[in-house]
Amino acid sequence: GNWLAQLKGEQQAQALALLRRSETLPWIIEIACANGVNVIAHANYPSSHYVRDKPVNKQSVLWDRARLRELMSGNEAGIAGADHFWFGHTPLKTRYDCQNLHYIDTGAVFGGALTLAQLQ
């Protein structure tokens, strides 16, 4: 965004280095807890069955809201392969849980509440 273009010299170089480094971070995180296997992704897991390290469309992981729209229109289908799936990206008034899917973005970036979930 504009914030990066407005940085100068060493600050911009450092920001660019951190951005490049962030490209090596995982797109999907799996955590085994007492409550089972928890999968965390930004917006969606683009499959009806989770498999660790399964190749998936990264753009869908980051941006896709189709599953949430389907859930909210009454098509309640969870994802097989793990006990819980945690998503953000789409600000909602309150946390939304359906089947084994949990949407916890409550718009903190826009002045809404910050929702946290303790997995263990």
Question: How would you name each of these model-derived features?
Answer:
Residues 1-103, 107-113, 119-120:
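Acidic, His/Gly-enriched loop-helix segments that form or flank divalent-metal centers
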